[in-house]
Amino acid sequence: MTRILEIGGRRLPFLRWSVLRMLLGMRGLTRNWQVGDGREEALAAHVLAHARPGDLDEAIRVIDDFCVTRSVMMNVGDEKGEILDHAVQRVSPGLLLELGTYCGYSGLRMARVMPEGARFCSIEFSPANADIARRIWAHAGVGDRLTVVVGSLGDGGATIERLCSEFGFTDGGLDFAVVDHDKKAYLPDLERIQRERWLHPGSVVVADNVKFPGAPEYRAYLHAEEGRTWRTIEHDTHLEYQSLVKDLVLESEYLGEPA
C-alpha cells in the first residue's frame, strides 16, 4: 500500500495497515478509548524522546511524523487541524472547551493559536489518555495553559459541576468548543451545553469525524436548526493521515435562542 497523496505540502499515505488496525479496533474504543495495541503510550514516549522540550511546534511536528511513518492515531490530524486552527484564530476565544482529549494533539494546536491568557479545558473519559496528554503538554511547555478533566458531560452532572465550580464556566462564558469524542454523544452533549446556557451568540463549535465514523444525528440536528439557532459550514476533508476515507468537519456558529 504505497500510493501517496500530497496535502498541505505533506505527502500522506493513501491507506496503511495501521489505519486498518485502528478501524478494526474501534469496537473497543467505547470501553477504554485506546486502539489496544499500545500506540498511545508509544506516541508519548516518542514525543518525549524526539521533540525538544518546550518547543510546541516541534511537538506537533513529531506527532504528525509518528502518525505518518509509524501508527495512525485518532488525532484530528494535520489536514483537519488546519481547519481547527483557522476557526480558533477567527474566534479569538477567551474560554475553550474540548470534548475528547485523546493524547492531547488538538490541545497543542489550539495552544499555538489561542490568545495569550485564554483558558482551555478538555474533558477525557480515559484516565490513561488524560495522563498521556498531560505528559505531552508538559513536555511541549504548555502544561500550565491546558487542563484535562477526567469525566464526561453525561456522567450525571459531576463533570458539569466541576466545570462551573472549578473552571469558571458560566452563562454565556464559553466562546469555542471542539467535539471529538464518542460520536453517539455529540448531540446529547451539545444539548447539555445549550441547557447550561454556556454559549453566547457568536460562540463556535467544531465537530470532527461527522462523516466517518459518523455523527448523523448531530448533523441532522444542525441542518434542522440552520439559520435558526445555528449557522454551519461543512468542510469536506479526509479521515486523519490518509486519503481514501472521506470525512466532514462541521464548524457551527451559535446564533442564540430564537425569540
Regions found by a protein language model. Give the residues of each.
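N-terminal auxiliary segments of SAM/dcSAM-dependent transferases
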Residues: 1-56
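Conserved SAM-binding loop and adjacent beta-strand
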Residues: 35-37, 52-55, 69-83
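Conserved class I S-adenosyl-L-methionine
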Residues: 58-69
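SAM cofactor-binding core of SAM-dependent methyltransferases
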Residues: 72-158
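Hydrophobic packing residues within well-ordered alpha-helices of enzyme cores
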Residues: 110, 133, 137, 160, ...
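Active-site segment flanking the S-adenosylmethionine/decSAM binding pocket
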Residues: 146-213
